Regions:
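Flexible, surface-exposed loop regions and adjacent strand-edge segments
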Residues: 16-22, 66-73, 148-158, 207-217, ...
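Short loop/turn motifs that connect adjacent beta-strands in outer-membrane beta-barrel proteins
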Residues: 30-47, 125-128, 183-190, 203-208, ...
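C-terminal beta-signal and terminal closure region of outer-membrane beta-barrel proteins
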Residues: 66, 159, 163-171, 214-241, ...
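Extracytoplasmic gating/loop element in the C-terminal half of outer-membrane beta-barrel translocons
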Residues: 254, 309-398
Length: 438
């Protein structure tokens, strides 16, 4: 059991200090008397159940003095102090005029996360199998929402909207680890370490407008969910062009070879407010897995490492796509009128029109990668000892040897450094080496 009494000057004296506590409890089941027979037979070597619960706080609440109203002098369009007329002859008031520049919220407070975890650790059959399982859940509440991201009616009269603690979000999932180690009578050893993680979050409450459709609200979707215009192939003929829904912007510039953008809400007009819909997942994988497999025998050894992810969407927004430069190689092949094929809308002498991208740059980011493979032989006896060395190892390995994915390239991320430079593609390498130990 532990606790912390935390304070932050971002909040008013009434909300500045909060006590957060947590605790954990474990039970070594394998040490109980009723487990003795299983331990003696080396069926169960160790089995432990554990759980924890606790709260932590977050004071990332925008401006430092958000609980205090910020007043400013009234100025004209040129930035000069402006005093209001006070008589029929137009003479100005001798007093300085102020207005509420930022409306405060004195009730701003710590955002809180209630973290819960329950799991178990195990070892079976004389250490042949071992691993763990964990189920976790984080309930976040009083999440900070800035005034700029709040929903206010059109008749709201102030220049700014006060910040608020209102958001709620749930994050949950589980982790599985399995380890295998087996040595045969002839000294041959097999071993494996494998992990799998599932993690999902859902926004339970945000300051969404009450009367908008559910697909336009953040509530019910994951943090970081992609919203996009939905494209349904290309406009291939003039008949298809004339039958497409009108577009709020640049409707007169739509051409054959552009994407057919779906009028998601069916009102006859494609617009940014009503026709961008949830698409795919977030940029963080919901499912991740990895495994390392090894084998050893009489100086020979081999191992392979593989990993992958699913439940993820990648927005391939490379620097070469800036300003709609549709002629770059990275963008893919243009639509052509001969067979209607291609990946990119028909090229123009000017920049791309609005809405044309659709889901063009949103890809299923799932992948399976064979990360490393190594084969080696190690001498530890005989002639190597006579030469005064303890061991000599020859090895051949490779990195990034195999990849299965629907992504258009093999990059860990879109950008490689601050400033927006494109990330260098993942490199395949082969190495041969000698390791000599004295």
């Amino acid at each position: 059991v532990n606790g912390a009494y935390n304070g932050s000057q971002k909040f008013s004296p009434d909300n500045r200090f909060v006590f957060f506590a947590s605790g954990a409890l474990g039970w070594m089941v394998s040490d109980e008397k009723f487990m003795k027979k299983l331990k003696d037979k080396k069926i169960v070597d160790m089995f432990k159940i554990r759980g924890s619960i606790g709260e932590i706080g977050d004071d990332n609440a925008g401006a430092r003095w958000a609980y205090l109203t910020d007043w400013a002098i009234v100025t004209d369009n040129s930035g000069n102090q402006q005093n209001f007329p006070m008589s029929i002859d137009g003479s100005s008031s001798p007093y300085t005029s102020y207005y509420e520049k930022t409306i405060a919220n004195p009730d701003l407070r710590w955002a809180t996360v209630l973290k819960k975890n329950i799991g178990f650790d195990y070892a079976l059959f004389g250490g042949m199998f071992a691993g763990s399982f964990d189920y976790f859940r984080d309930d976040r509440y009083d999440i900070f929402i800035s005034g700029a991201n709040r929903s206010v009616p059109s008749y709201y009269g102030a220049k700014t909207t006060p910040d608020i603690n209102k958001g709620k979000m749930k994050n949950y999932g589980f982790e599985i680890e399995v380890r295998f180690n087996r040595v045969l009578n002839n000294g041959m050893r097999f071993w494996t370490n494998a992990n799998y993680t599932y993690a999902h979050n859902v926004i339970k409450l945000k300051d969404d407008p009450a009367l908008i459709p559910a697909y336009r609200k953040a509530q019910g979707y994951s943090q970081g969910q992609y919203w996009s215009f939905i494209d349904n192939g290309f406009i291939g003929t003039y008949d298809e062009l004339y039958s497409t829904p009108a577009r709020e912007k640049d409707d007169s510039q739509v051409l054959i070879g552009d994407h057919y953008i779906v009028d998601f809400n069916g009102d006859g007009v494609v617009d940014e407010t009503n026709d961008q819909a949830p698409y795919g997942y977030t940029g963080t994988p919901e499912h991740t897995y990895n495994a390392t497999i090894g084998w050893e025998w009489k100086g020979w050894s081999m191992f392979a490492q593989l990993y992958g992810a699913t439940g993820v969407t990648r927005d391939v927004g490379l620097t070469s796509f800036n300003n709609k430069l549709l002629t770059v190689y990275d963008n893919g092949t243009w639509w052509n009128p001969v067979d209607g094929g291609g990946e990119v809308v028909v090229p123009r002498f000017t920049t791309q029109v609005s809405y044309n991208d659709g889901t063009q740059f949103l890809f299923d980011g799932s992948y399976f990668r064979l990360k490393n493979v190594e084969v080696a032989y190690t001498w530890t006896k005989g002639w190597i000892k006579k030469l005064g060395f303890s061991s000599l190892k020859l090895y051949l390995n490779g990195n990034n040897l195999f990849l299965i994915t629907k992504m258009p390239d093999d990059r860990e991320s879109n950008y490689g450094f601050s400033g927006g430079g494109g990330a260098y593609p993942t490199v395949r390498r082969y190495n041969f080496g000698i390791k000599l130990n004295i």
